[in-house]
Design a protein with these regions (language model features):
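Phosphate/pyrophosphate-binding loops and the adjoining catalytic core of nucleotide-dependent enzymes
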Residues: 17
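Flexible, acidic glycine-rich loops studded with aromatic residues
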Residues: 117-222
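Active-site beta->alpha loop and helix N-cap motifs at the rims of alpha/beta catalytic domains
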Residues: 1-13
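Catalytic alpha/beta core domains of metabolic enzymes, predominantly
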Residues: 14, 22-156
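Short secondary-structure capping/turn micro-motifs that flank functional sites
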Residues: 10, 32-34, 201-202, 215
Length: 229
């Protein structure tokens, strides 16, 4: 899959790639508003591909949410002043994203595409190991179970879940509680729009730094090879 960040500039790229039958991993998905644009770009891309006579059956895509980063940032901002709100925002955000996912991929618009073999764009839960040792080591895997989803657990988390994790379709439960949590976070001075914007900026910087480092290494290697010729 080609990685495309969930940014305003990335949205038309997602549609264009899907429209050409190219599989896409939409990465750095944090904001529910941007996620709405991501789903629309995917579905519109499938329509474009079908209109051009392409094979929509062969197209796959995921929208990757980085889970633990949300709680790490919010917990640091809360500074133990609201212990009842800590370690909950990431799961709440994922539950609301999954609700929106189900709404769009059971819509008449998508169902018409699915009759021709279109696949849903699956939510992918990344960074699902707990960073706070006070939290259960299977907190995120247990809370993020739902149909048509992917969880990229690190080996230690996978082994822990295999040993003592509990399986239930947890993503679709307690949606009202998830919505209420964001109200309570706002009352505590934490706004999800600010949180998701900061996380996206951090993620993009990591990608840019990694890319620049790779290009620098390639350039260095090229110069060494030229000296040997």
């Amino acid at each position: 899959m080609v990685k495309v960040p969930a940014t305003p500039a990335g949205i038309p790229a997602i549609r264009a790639l899907i429209g050409k039958g190219i599989n896409v991993n939409v990465t750095l998905t944090f904001s529910l508003d941007i996620y709405s644009d991501v789903r629309k770009a995917y579905i519109d891309g499938l329509e474009d591909l079908k209109k051009d006579g392409g094979n929509i059956k062969s197209v796959s895509s995921v929208a990757s949410f980085f889970i633990s980063r949300v709680d790490t940032l919010i917990d640091d901002a809360l500074e133990d002043n609201h212990p009842d709100l800590m370690g909950k925002a990431a799961i709440a955000n994922a539950k609301l994203a999954y609700r929106d996912f189900n709404n769009d991929f059971t819509s008449d618009k998508f169902l018409r595409l699915s009759q021709h073999g279109a696949r849903v764009q699956r939510p992918l839960w990344a960074s699902t190991s707990t960073k706070n040792p006070q939290y259960s080591d299977v907190l995120y895997p247990e809370s993020l179970i739902g149909r048509d989803t992917v969880n990229t657990m690190p080996e230690s988390t996978l082994l822990a879940f295999n040993e003592h994790g509990k399986v239930s379709e947890s993503l679709g439960s307690n949606i009202d509680d998830a919505t209420q949590l964001f109200v309570e976070l706002q009352e505590a001075g934490i706004y999800m729009k600010d949180v998701t914007s900061e996380l996206l900026a951090q993620g993009l910087k990591l990608f840019i730094d990694s890319y620049d480092s790779l290009i620098s290494d390639i350039e260095h290697k090229r110069k060494l090879l030229e000296l040997r010729i």
